[in-house]
């Protein structure tokens, strides 16, 4: 499946359908090949019925403000770029004020697949 994007926009935003205990939503996740893990905003996780505050499993990440330990949740289901994952592991973290996305699609989503970002055609393809 190919997704069109605006090469002048700065971020490549991937519409991502996510299911949780309280329902489903379409989140706006930035494609981020510099992120090892995919990340969902704390607010969206809570909206979907997850409670990141009670999660025992935490992963150390480095942010612009320092080192933090953030909860990891297993999503009921996630669909993006024609790929469906059940139990997909995702970090939860508060995003900065003014963020225009709901999180990041990182390398753990793309591993084992071929990702092509074509700036001439302004498309993203995941095989």
What are these regions (language model features)?
Residues 1-127:
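Pepsin/retropepsin-fold aspartyl endopeptidases
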């Amino acid at each position: 499946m190919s997704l069109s994007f605006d090469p002048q926009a700065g971020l490549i935003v991937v519409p991502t359908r996510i299911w949780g205990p309280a329902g489903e939503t379409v989140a706006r996740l930035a494609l981020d090949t510099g992120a090892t893990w995919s990340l969902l905003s704390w607010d969206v996780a809570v909206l979907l019925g997850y409670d990141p505050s009670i999660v025992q499993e935490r992963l150390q990440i480095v942010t612009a403000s320092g080192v933090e330990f953030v909860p990891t949740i297993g999503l009921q289901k996630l669909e993006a770029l024609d790929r469906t994952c059940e139990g997909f592991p995702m970090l939860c973290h508060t995003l900065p004020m003014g963020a225009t996305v709901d999180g990041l699609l990182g390398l753990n989503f793309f591993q084992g697949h071929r990702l092509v970002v074509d700036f001439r055609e302004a498309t993203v393809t995941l095989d």
